[in-house]
Amino acid sequence: MHLASFMFKNALLNADKKTKNNFLSSLKKVIVSIIKEENLKVSIDDMEYFDNKALYQFTIPTKSKAQRATYTIFLQTLRIVALLHDVGHLPFSHQVEYALKKVYDKIKEKEQKIEDLCEKELRFKNNYEEITNNSKEVLHEAIGENLLKLLFDYELEELLVKSYEKEYLKLIKRLSILILDEQVFEGFDFKVLHNFIDSTVDADRLDYINRDMLASGYITGPNDHIRITKQAVLV
């Protein structure tokens, strides 16, 4: 979450003025469309809820209040997605995930040969396909997205009292799903934002490289993730 924040901030700081303004304009268009589409009682020009002192270290110079609000909304969304994107991992991480995929593939192979499936095989197949959208999604990512929706719909909903805060919550939930699913909305490709968390050099890898080395007993100099995140640039 912290590294994703720095990568997002520095990517915009290092971008040329035209690229940054065009990028934020595209993001503002997305927010305005969602507000209108879902009839949310919030305004992009007056979002005091996101004027959070805890986020000052991640602020960037902007030309308007609306542009600052746009940046902060997406910063918060990216932080939530980064925090929760791996929450769907099963015990022993990818190993169990690969094993379950092999079980599913064997059941599908058996089904294609028109062989009868036992009750357990049929139940496993149906559950797996329901969670992974007919095996189109990676298991831990699909589980994570479902958990994110539950978090927004139940846990966070109960923590907020003011009605306008709940409206913001609906907005961030929608943006989070757009990022996780790498959807294209209002002409903007959300894969661009997902790349901060899931790409060749991303916040996730920078984080777990240091943690895995420490956990495995390999004591050496950690990678300089601050220097690396400072090199991020939006093009």
Language model region names:
Residues 2-80, 88-235:
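Sequence-structural signature of the catalytic-core scaffold of metal-dependent phosphohydrolases
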